[in-house]
């Protein structure tokens, strides 16, 4: 999926400014995302792809021996962020139809669990969970366990009963929704991901990120992409 022609034009127009550092706080992009989703800018985090946000979350949240619960198979980076920090990857097999086993995931949460990740739609199987099922799942978890819902492929779901989880995120103090411009907007090579999160989480991510983690052209492209 290529980017919109208007995005290409915006990037080319901005190319003469690549000798200047990017906005380290990504204020314009974060404001554009906040406006899109009806949130405050303080609830928006951006990174050099969603991978970057997951790595930052690992740096901010995980210590040696902490547990992270997620499905198996799912996005391979989840296991990697655990391994690099000495955290324990608690991998719950998918059900026979390749759906998340949410009951087993909830049962796997212990006092050592810091993070639960739900990839929805799941990568690589493509199965998705209705928002109501995710809400019921979150209700079973302690509020001190952070839940990240990875919606990297949300733009590709055509089912009538599909609902994203941004409404759920607004209602729960321990839920983040992570997304990317790589898939639906065709910007994989520029690396832009974003999270809609409680401000405690965005503040924690900001403390551990590099100051210029999203380059100038990527910010221009993402802002323009949101207009289409």
Regions inferred by a protein language model and the residue ranges of each:
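Short hydrophobic alpha-helical segments of the AMP-binding
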Residues: 33, 81-82, 141
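Short glycine-rich anion-binding loops that position phosphate/pyrophosphate groups of nucleotides
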Residues: 1, 50-51, 75, 120-124, ...
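PLP-dependent aminotransferase class I/II
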Residues: 4, 10, 25, 174-228
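N-terminal small-domain helix-loop-helix segment of the aminotransferase-like
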Residues: 1-51, 56
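Active-site pre-lysine segment of PLP-dependent enzymes
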Residues: 102-111, 124-147, 151-187, 200
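Short acidic capping loops at alpha-helix termini that bridge into adjacent secondary structure
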Residues: 40-44, 64-67, 112, 144, ...
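PLP-dependent aminotransferase-like
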Residues: 60-118, 132
């Amino acid at each position: 999926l290529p980017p919109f022609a208007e995005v290409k034009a915006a990037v080319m127009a901005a190319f003469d400014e690549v000798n200047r550092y990017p906005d380290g706080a990504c204020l314009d992009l974060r404001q554009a995302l906040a406006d899109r989703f009806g949130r405050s800018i303080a609830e928006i985090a951006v990174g050099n792809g969603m991978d970057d946000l997951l790595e930052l979350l690992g740096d901010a949240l995980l210590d040696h021996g902490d547990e992270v619960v997620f499905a198996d198979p799912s996005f391979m980076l989840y296991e990697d962020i655990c391994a690099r920090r000495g955290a324990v990857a608690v991998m719950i097999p998918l059900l026979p139809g390749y759906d998340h086993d949410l009951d087993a995931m909830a049962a796997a949460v212990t006092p050592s669990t810091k993070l639960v990740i739900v990839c929805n739609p799941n990568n690589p199987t493509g199965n998705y969970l209705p928002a109501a099922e995710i809400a019921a799942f979150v209700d079973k978890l302690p509020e001190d366990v952070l839940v990240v819902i990875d919606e990297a492929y949300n733009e590709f779901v055509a089912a009538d009963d599909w609902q994203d989880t941004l409404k759920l995120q607004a209602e729960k103090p321990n839920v983040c929704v992570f997304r990317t411009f790589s898939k639906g907007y065709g910007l994989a090579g520029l690396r832009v991901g974003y999270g809609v999160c409680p401000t405690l989480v965005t503040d924690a991510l900001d403390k551990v990120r590099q100051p210029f983690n999203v380059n100038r052209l990527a910010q221009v492209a993402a802002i323009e992409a949101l207009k289409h």
